[in-house]
Amino acid sequence: MSQPPLLDHATQTMANGSKSFATAAKLFDPATRRSVLMLYTWCRHCDDVIDDQTHGFASEAAAEEEATQRLARLRTLTLAAFEGAEMQDPAFAAFQEVALTHGITPRMALDHLDGFAMDVAQTRYVTFEDTLRYCYHVAGVVGLMMARVMGVRDERVLDRACDLGLAFQLTNIARDIIDDAAIDRCYLPAEWLQDAGLTPENYAARENRAALARVAERLIDAAEPYYISSQAGLHDLPPRCAWAIATARSVYREIGIKVKAAGGSAWDRRQHTSKGEKIAMLMAAPGQVIRAKTTRVTPRPAGLWQRPV
């Protein structure tokens, strides 16, 4: 039997957009997997619309809109989805289903869109705190929404989900420094660039790769406490959800390890995990879940960045 069109669209979106997460997503039970795919579809669509990688809307005129106008339309359609309006776009129909089913709040969705607003405004990040704030909007709040899909309502567990999103995004930033620079985006703290003898104007130059590698290493090291904190969140997830998240956590963390190990050559090719490595992590993840579920959960470290409440 073929999949329903909406699910088929969501499945293809995940396959095209995130090979790192696609493997882990297969581990969810069917109902949770459907909701995860639906949520991812909306996130991916919003990202593509802001970057003008897809028209995103039925009218050809939409492709000519300025980014600020595209962002405003995304906000309007997102709020309409919450209000129960009939959604013609598959991405918003998918989001409407998952948001209304799992109690995702308008604030969560709008917080995510605020991250795209930071890109539209070409926000510059001076401190690591500034970078973490961006990471919250584009990934930490996605962790919150994904956790709600998995049945999480405890604020302490949601904190751990947010931590994993922060860790994922810090890893993404380190991996994609040069690709982002090519489209005039820099998420690295200017203070860290200065510490390495770099500037926002010259950090991406090939002759500065050794110094840039030190900044990337610092970023990967900064992600580690958030990866560690997120481990405790597995304790309260349903078993198959915990298995999927533990796998995704291992895959993304390994990408950071590869970036760090490659040094100045980290951006000569896109750092990734092989199919064999993903399978090995998938098989090792149940052990992580068992440890998390049989270990007393300690309080979240006070020094970690705290999401807005």
Curated annotation (Swiss-Prot):
It comes from the Bacteria. Pfam families: SQS_PSY. InterPro entries: Isoprenoid_synthase_dom_sf (IPR008949), Phytoene_synthase-rel (IPR053452), Squ/phyt_synthse (IPR002060), Squalene/phytoene_synthase_CS (IPR019845), Trans_IPPS_bact-type (IPR044843), Trans_IPPS_HH (IPR033904). Pathway: Carotenoid biosynthesis; phytoene biosynthesis. Its cofactor is ATP; Mn(2+); Mg(2+). ATP is required for the transferase activity but it does not seem to be hydrolyzed during the reaction. One of its GO terms (molecular function) is metal ion binding. NCBIfam families: Phyto_syn_CrtB. This is Phytoene synthase. It comes from Pseudescherichia vulneris. The gene is crtB.
